[in-house]
A protein has these predicted regions:
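N-terminal alpha-helical interaction modules that lie
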Residues: 1-106, 143-183
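Start-of-helix signal in alpha-solenoid helical-repeat scaffolds, especially tetratricopeptide repeats
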Residues: 63, 112, 116-119
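Structural register within alpha-helical repeat arrays
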Residues: 69, 118, 123-125, 142
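Residue at a conserved register position within TPR or TPR-like alpha-solenoid repeats
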Residues: 73, 80, 122-125, 129
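A short, structured loop/turn motif at beta-sheet edges
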Residues: 106-112
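A structural signal for the main folded, soluble domain(s) of proteins
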Residues: 112, 138-141
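Structural signature of tandem alpha-helical TPR/SEL1-like repeats
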Residues: 132-134
Length: 183
């Protein structure tokens, strides 16, 4: 039986597949996706992750949900929406997820995987600092403390399949070759 997080992941992949299948200029595809409500659907997925975070008690699942929220916050700003189906995420959801992340940093609750992911996203500090500066001290310090001259994601080091079934976050990290290649 699929969990709620699996269902949200499947919905993410469906939207990504649909966006990827579109033809035309970036402007044309963006307009088409907007008219078809694709961006609204993704905004709802993003909000649903946050709602699920607050409904469950499993700390491992909460951490996974937070990883996906932070990825989507970042990805919505760095990748054109015509390729992802993600546009104009709800600012309250983005802010709340960064606030949760700030507390995780204070409490030392992020794992090694989340640390390298967040270090990678911090190379685009403009995606995080507007939400954290003068509000979320631990997150701001983390972002500003990252050495952006060093590639923070593991290349061909993670076990094959570790990024499977993790929504667009998993698709992205597979495309960045973080998993070992099978010879």
């Amino acid at each position: 039986m699929k969990t709620e997080i699996d269902i949200l992941s499947d919905r993410e992949v469906e939207i990504w597949d649909y966006a990827e299948s579109q033809n035309g200029t970036m402007d044309f595809v963006t307009e088409k996706l907007a008219e078809e409500g694709i961006f609204d659907q993704y905004r709802n997925i993003h909000k649903s992750y946050l709602e699920l975070y607050f409904r469950i008690d499993d700390e491992g699942a909460k951490l996974e949900i937070l990883k996906r929220l932070i990825f989507l916050n970042w990805y919505a700003q760095v990748e054109p929406s015509c390729y992802t189906g993600i546009e104009d995420l709800d600012n309250a959801t983005v802010s709340e997820s960064y606030s949760i992340l700030n507390q995780y940093l204070i409490d030392g609750k992020i794992d090694a995987e989340f640390k390298w992911m967040l270090s990678f996203y911090s190379s685009w500090d403009y995606t995080i600092l507007p939400f954290s500066e003068n509000k979320l001290e631990a997150l701001t310090a983390f972002v500003k403390g990252v050495d952006t001259s060093i590639l923070s994601c593991p290349k061909n080091q993670l076990p094959k399949g570790v990024m499977d079934n993790r929504g667009q976050m998993g698709i992205y990290w597979i495309s960045m070759s973080v998993e070992k290649k099978i010879m």
